[in-house]
């Protein structure tokens, strides 16, 4: 069986490892900028300068990276889309 693809974890980990600055929008309209230092199933640790914010994921509306993020090559994307279509048809 193929390995499960966890988009959220891969996206957050890519941002963390590559130290890409992000803008985080919360559901209450508040926005903040910083670098993702860590994350788990429920929270994201955002660091900006000397300040850290532990943000609960359920409070996050949108995360916008400062640069483009490619999580997998185009060839894999096409294969995954085909697999998803096959699974939906079953």
Swiss-Prot record:
Start and end residues of each Sm domain: 9-69
Subunit structure: Homohexamer.
UniProt key word Ion transport: no
Organism: Thermotoga petrophila (strain ATCC BAA-488 / DSM 13995 / JCM 10881 / RKU-1)
Family: Belongs to the Hfq family.
Pfam families with a match to the protein in the record: Hfq
Coiled-coil annotated residue ranges, if any: none
Record-linked SUPFAM superfamilies: Sm-like ribonucleoproteins (SSF50182)
CDD domains associated with the record: Hfq
Listed NCBIfam families: Hfq, PRK00395.1
Gene3D superfamilies per UniProt: 2.30.30.100
Protein name per Swiss-Prot or TrEMBL: RNA-binding protein Hfq
Sample GO molecular function, one term: RNA binding
Record keywords, A-Z: RNA-binding, Stress response
Function: RNA chaperone that binds small regulatory RNA (sRNAs) and mRNAs to facilitate mRNA translational regulation in response to envelope stress, environmental stress and changes in metabolite concentrations. Also binds with high specificity to tRNAs.
Gene Ontology cellular component list: cytosol
Keyword RNA-binding: yes
Record-linked HAMAP family: Hfq (MF_00436)
One BP annotation, GO: regulation of RNA stability
Highest taxon listed in the record's lineage: Bacteria
């Amino acid at each position: 069986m193929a390995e499960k693809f966890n988009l959220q974890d891969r996206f957050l980990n890519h941002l963390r490892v590559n130290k890409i600055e992000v803008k985080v929008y919360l559901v209450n309209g508040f926005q903040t900028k910083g670098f993702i230092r860590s994350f788990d199933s429920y929270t994201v640790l955002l660091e900006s300068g000397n300040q850290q914010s532990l943000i609960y994921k359920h409070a996050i509306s949108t995360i916008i990276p400062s640069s483009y993020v490619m999580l997998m090559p185009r060839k894999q994307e096409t294969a995954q889309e085909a697999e998803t279509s096959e699974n939906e048809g079953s």
